[in-house]
């Protein structure tokens, strides 16, 4: 046997054990990653199942904002008070649905038509200028997900949205949303928002007040109490005209 043939045989004999070890290590790594992924999904699922009958004390977004606020005000606290669904003005429920997700009662967490339109507009503008998140998707972001845009976030958001829509009723989804959504710097939920902006409880909000709160939602920290802008006036008027047609649980 030639020396070249002997060298080739030894190289093959040496490479096979290394290849088997590499494949075994890769398989174990993938298996551990899969187990971790499933465990994370069960963690999300367990929280949503628990919140079917229990109220979340805070959200990931609220906790993140509190850390930021306390950088300037170490003793700062969030304005937040949970109120049950029946103690939230029906005007506010309709105004928020009209403003944020007018197909809320008819979809299963995703408004595909709105998503397509938003995608086309973003492509046309060459940047992200429009979104199409439903109330369910917004709630998922508030409850669980960080504010950073990372590659896995959209996939995880979609998975949790399916869990949310499967385990919770539309009434419960809207109840939680209205109790945790941001309505000012450090102001969360309908009760705190109604008192902060208008000095009344959430159940007593008028149609005009409800429409004004709904108009603030895209950028609530931009509107301290008493501030009035042309955009806010126009947006409020639009919501007022549409809210009577909004379907709510």
Locations of regions flagged by a protein language model:
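Juxtamembrane regions of bacterial inner-membrane/periplasmic proteins
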Residues: 2-8, 14, 18-249
């Amino acid at each position: 046997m030639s020396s070249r043939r002997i060298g080739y045989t030894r190289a093959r004999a040496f490479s096979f054990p290394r290849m088997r070890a590499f494949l075994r290590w890769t398989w174990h790594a993938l298996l551990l990653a899969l187990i971790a992924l499933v465990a994370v999904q069960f963690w999300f699922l367990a929280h949503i199942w628990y919140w079917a009958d229990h109220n979340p004390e805070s959200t990931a977004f609220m906790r993140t904002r509190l850390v930021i606020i306390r950088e300037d005000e170490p003793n700062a606290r969030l304005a937040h008070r949970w109120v049950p669904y029946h103690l939230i003005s029906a005007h506010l429920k309709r105004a928020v649905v009209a403003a944020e997700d007018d197909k809320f009662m008819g979809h299963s967490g995703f408004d595909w038509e709105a998503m397509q339109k938003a995608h086309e507009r973003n492509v046309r503008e060459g940047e992200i200028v429009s979104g199409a998140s439903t109330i369910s998707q917004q709630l998922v972001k508030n409850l669980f997900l960080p504010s950073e845009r990372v590659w896995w976030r959209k996939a995880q958001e979609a998975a949790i949205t399916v869990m949310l829509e499967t385990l919770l009723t539309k009434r419960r989804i809207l109840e939680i949303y209205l109790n945790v959504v941001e309505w000012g710097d450090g102001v969360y939920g309908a009760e705190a928002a109604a008192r902060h902006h208008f000095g009344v409880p959430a159940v007593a909000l008028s149609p005009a007040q409800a429409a004004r709160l709904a108009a603030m939602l895209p950028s609530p920290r931009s509107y301290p109490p008493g501030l009035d802008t042309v955009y806010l006036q126009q947006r409020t008027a639009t919501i007022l005209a549409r809210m009577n047609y909004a379907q709510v649980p």
